[in-house]
Amino acid sequence: MKAMFLMDFITVKKLLRRYLLLLLGMGGAAALMMGSHPGIIPYFGMISVVSVAQALALYDDRRDWSRFRLTMPLTRTGVVLGRYAFLAAVAAAGTLMGVAVYLAATLAVQGVPAYAALVLRPGGFDAIGLAWSAAASLALAFVVGGIMLPTFFSFGMGNGPRYAMALIMMVSVLAINPIVNVWARPEAAPAFLGGLVSLATSSETLLAVAGALAASAFALYAVSCAACLAAYRRRDF
């Protein structure tokens, strides 16, 4: 697993610098408009995972690494676990980058009154919002990564993105629609969803809900890894 982790890092090492500059540019633009808003954080984790996963899959297809890699002292288990571990590290790094941008924007809002008068949210530091946004960033990254990696391992970069995007859209609809319905018509919401909403709106339990969200997404990521590993062992190269 360690060898595969290092191979993936070396493969996208130069691209990571470009992605870093791109994310900082996007984060800076978002901060200029939104100001001290922790809602900018979740985009960092998800965009980092999508960009790196696609770059690795494209590199595998162009260089035929999927076959050549098996002639090296690497097991199929190590290949799958190493890539999943590397993408998890990318998700964590992207989230930390988003946190850094949020903290910088918060300091700028507090230190530059002219800037604070222009942004949408000129408030101060929001610890609960920061924790929730960081958890949401990791959750989105793990869910998207858990969908993309099995499709890329099975179909490569040629057909993988089609299936991955279709699955991501389906999961998004299934996850977002209940939330929208509860927000629009809370009186008609099922008791289970109503209870979750009451927990999410309580500051005492919001941190626990955020932690549960990230843990659930990581569990899904682990299940995806196990399923991908089982399929990759049977794949005929």
Go through the PLM ranges and name each one.
Residues G78-V80:
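Alpha-helix N-cap/helix-start motif at helix boundaries, enriched for small hydrophobics
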Residues M1-S66, G82-F237:
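Hydrophobic alpha-helical transmembrane segments of membrane proteins
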